[in-house]
Amino acid sequence: MNVFWFLPTHGDGHYLGTTKGARPVTLNYLKQVAQAADDLGYYGVLIPTGRSCEDSWVIASALVPLTERLKYLVAIRPGIISPTVSARMAATLDRLSGGRLLINVVTGGDPDENRGDGSFLDHSERYEVTDEFLHIWRRVLQGEAVDFEGKHLRVQNAKALYPPIQKPYPPLYFGGSSDAAHDLAADQVDVYLTWGEPPAAVAQKLADVRERAARKGRTVKFGIRLHVIVRQTSEEAWKAASTLIEHISDETIAAAQKSFSRFDSEGQRRMAALHDGRRDNLEIAPNLWAGVGLVRGGAGTALVGNPQEVAERIKEYADLGIESFIFSAYPHLEEAYRFAELVFPLLPEPYASLAGRGITNLTGPFGEMIANDLPPQAK
């Protein structure tokens, strides 16, 4: 099991949809989140991409030297950048990070944003471009001098003279819910990602990708992207979920859902269908809450509950074949600690041994001394 955290390069705070309780996302703040994740023993962090975010490659480059073990899941955007240039960027960051780069392949589901970035392709064309892009990208990073002429992309003698540390190349992660996405995942990527739909729906998606990959003689690993709201008791967790959205007006929800409706992303459509823009009945499966998706694009569901309940839901997804869990919570700095302290002890190794104390060569005692004389009692 690989447990990731998330860098909130598009904003952070205590509530959704309001400036109340918001905090500036400065480099120093992102450094705190990344170093907390590194110290606590998270496997890596996802850095989001898009016009609502700071640039993921610049952020990763700034944070790599400030962390020791943490891996960075950074987006590439086929159709926006040359596959050869993208491959060289990946090789350099992998080399400079000591092999800590992971690649998130993003086709882009917002036509308005895509046009702003210079891409006027429709849904099927974007997947055609992504397929051609990855054929070039993968071969370049394996040391080939690539000649390729496809429907959308053409290169001659494309090469990267400085190879990546990871072989054959930094692992490719990718998410999508359409047939075209499942075909691409089965053919070209290492880890297929899904957003946090109910387990039965996730099982169907994984089975479909698994079957398509088998027909191509490949195996694909799986991951899931979820928010999490964990507290000592279930009652506290559900109260925190309600508090997270208490400042969102109905007008803000309507505006957000109108914006999402222009997307041609099947995954975004499935996220929106879980709540239909309504505040009532947001628990769509045991301990799975769709409230985040009222105003947030992309991952819109959260695991909500006490540590045992959250760990049970994680195990439920793991039993389906999920190996990588990418979590986030508001605010991301405090919640990185809370999740590690409350849930890590209930997860498989190495997380159980970390127990929220993180990776350290200190043997204890941990906690404040009592009366300036006695060590704290072990629990």
Swiss-Prot record:
Keywords: Flavoprotein, FMN, Monooxygenase, Oxidoreductase
InterPro entries assigned to the protein according to its UniProt record, in alphabetical order: Alkanesulphonate_mOase_FMN-dep (IPR019911), Luciferase-like_dom (IPR011251), Luciferase-like_sf (IPR036661), SsuD_RutA_monooxygenase (IPR050172)
Annotated EC: 1.14.14.5
Pfam families xref list: Bac_luciferase (PF00296)
Any single biological process term in GO: alkanesulfonate catabolic process
Chemical reaction(s) catalysed: an alkanesulfonate + FMNH2 + O2 = an aldehyde + FMN + sulfite + H2O + 2 H(+)
GO terms assigned for molecular function: alkanesulfonate monooxygenase activity
PANTHER family with a match to the protein in the record: ALKANESULFONATE MONOOXYGENASE, ALKANESULFONATE MONOOXYGENASE-RELATED
Entry's family note: Belongs to the SsuD family.
Function: Catalyzes the desulfonation of aliphatic sulfonates.
Name listed for the protein in its UniProt record: Alkanesulfonate monooxygenase
Gene name, Swiss-Prot/TrEMBL: ssuD
